[in-house]
Amino acid sequence: MPKVGMQPIRRQQLIQATLTAVDQVGMGDASIALIARLAGVSNGIISHYFQDKNGLIAATMRHLMNALIQNVRERRQALTEDSPRAHLQVIIEGNFDASQVSGPAMKTWLAFWATSMHHPSLHRLQRINDHRLYSNLCCQFRRTLPLEQARSAARGLAALIDGLWLRGALSGDAFDTEQAQRIAYEYMDFQLAKSAS
């Protein structure tokens, strides 16, 4: 009989083991057996909690997405001003937070993006994540720009964030958070300056 209260602990163990496995060998070779071994549990535990590898991958991605949401939320709560610029900055900072740019997180995101093209449930998660970023950016740009300009600025900044993140992930070097933020801030400021003209 399983111990009461073990489910959240086991689930977290398996998610961390998945991040480690993908970091070490990639998504394709991150087998149920390897993930279970890294977590120190039997293979059957994965089936018990997640049904299969895709269920575990989806849970791992929800974990990364929730970390992103939480990081942005905490930064928003710490804001001392309510300007669109301040809110856009925390969205940028959250997307380049250490929880999103560590080696295991970056490799898992990359593998997830590739896998999501072939698995409807993972594709749905990807679309939710994309829409959340775009709508949060658009909401802030809309506070100072006309609707079409706000939409365009949001699409551009979302693409820039993803592009900077992707180039950083593929570089093989440590992610340069300061540089990525600086470039994103420059684009943000360029777009916000349009409201004054």
UniProtKB/Swiss-Prot annotation:
The keyword Heme does not apply. Residues 31-50 bind DNA. This is HTH-type transcriptional regulator BetI. The keyword Cell cycle does not apply. GO terms for molecular function: DNA-binding transcription factor activity; transcription cis-regulatory region binding. Transmembrane segments: none annotated. Keywords: DNA-binding, Repressor, Transcription, Transcription regulation. Repressor involved in the biosynthesis of the osmoprotectant glycine betaine. It represses transcription of the choline transporter BetT and the genes of BetAB involved in the synthesis of glycine betaine. Residues 8-68 form the HTH tetR-type domain. It comes from the Bacteria. Pathway: Amine and polyamine biosynthesis; betaine biosynthesis via choline pathway [regulation]. It comes from Pseudomonas savastanoi pv. phaseolicola (strain 1448A / Race 6). GO terms for biological process: glycine betaine biosynthetic process from choline; negative regulation of DNA-templated transcription. InterPro entries: BetI_C, DNA-bd_HTH_TetR-type_CS, Homeodomain-like_sf, HTH-type_TetR-like_transc_reg, HTH_TetR, Tet_transcr_reg_TetR-rel_C_sf, Tscrpt_rep_BetI.
